[in-house]
Amino acid sequence: MSKKLKAAIIGPGNIGTDLVMKMLRSEWIEPVWMVGIDPESDGLKRARRFGLKTTAEGVDGLLPHVLEDDIRIAFDATSAYVHAENSRKLNEWGVLMVDLTPAAIGRYCVLRVNIKQNVGKLEMNVNMVTCGGQATSPMVAGVSRVQPVGYGKIVAKVFSRSIGPGTRKNIEEFNRTNAGAIEKVGGGKEGNAIIVLNTAHASFMICYTIHFFIKTEPDENPIIPSVHPIIAELQNYFPGYRLKNRPLFYRNPFSIFIEFEPLADYLXNYPGNLDIMTPPALPTLDIFPDKIAIATIQLPCLEPHLP
């Protein structure tokens, strides 16, 4: 592909800012616009320092520039409550939407499990689940392919400072979307999820515990060889992703313990959840350049929108 795909980021908070910093290192995508609603927000000021165009008028402030700036992709890092309308407005202009909120109106898109299938179908809206869903759904999928998972539960423990106001407003949606990912992506019959905000002390680590109830007696002989290759593959995207200790087998349920040490692009001291949420958003479109170049898929034509 001869030129980078041009992108807009909606939401200049923790996740949106971290995403911009990762995009600036990308060879195939160019962040052009940062969209917010507060002209004095630190995120918009920071985006301008990075050389991005900005608007404090929400998505409506971006729409007049979609054609002129050839915006093909938008990454929504706002809130589940406003995502559906953001997506509708930009989809009407032929802009693909990557949803980093827990809204989950599009297909769940999870690394190592179904990312290539979703991108290959050129879905106009794909949902990146949550940081917890990206970290744990592949583990559930790894177990369910060798033993049926009747019930799966994840417990996410993150440092409070890394959770921005948008995520705090969406805790219920966060838990519901993670539970849905256990079922729709991981293959569990029933899912549950909770998030625990750690305000007691600062920690670089973000920790996930996954409890599995297996329909039959858990057998570590097929389970261990099934999940270890998944961990190795996820480390290509999350270098700090690892098993905290050996999976604990004690009849039913059994548990897998994951910890993650982040890269610290933004909120350098406490970014745990950001570095799990933002890297999957970029590989979601990583196969676009090749597929577009060989005409396997074609992006929608950008045409003036008629009300």
UniProtKB/Swiss-Prot annotation:
One of its GO terms (molecular function) is acetaldehyde dehydrogenase (acetylating) activity. InterPro entries: Acetaldehyde_dehydrogenase, Acetylaldehyde_DH_C, NAD(P)-bd_dom_sf, Semialdehyde_DH_NAD-bd. Pfam families: AcetDehyd-dimer. One of its GO terms (biological process) is catabolic process. Its EC number is 1.2.1.10. SMART domains: Semialdhyde_dh. It is an enzyme of class 1 (oxidoreductase). NAD(+) binds at residues 162-170, 273. Keywords: Aromatic hydrocarbons catabolism, NAD, Oxidoreductase. SUPFAM superfamilies: Glyceraldehyde-3-phosphate dehydrogenase-like, C-terminal domain, NAD(P)-binding Rossmann-fold domains. It catalyses: acetaldehyde + NAD(+) + CoA = acetyl-CoA + NADH + H(+). The active site is at residue 131. HAMAP family: Ac_ald_DH_ac (MF_01657). Belongs to the acetaldehyde dehydrogenase family. This is Acetaldehyde dehydrogenase 1. The lineage of its organism: Bacteria, Pseudomonadati, Pseudomonadota, Gammaproteobacteria, Pseudomonadales. The gene is salG.
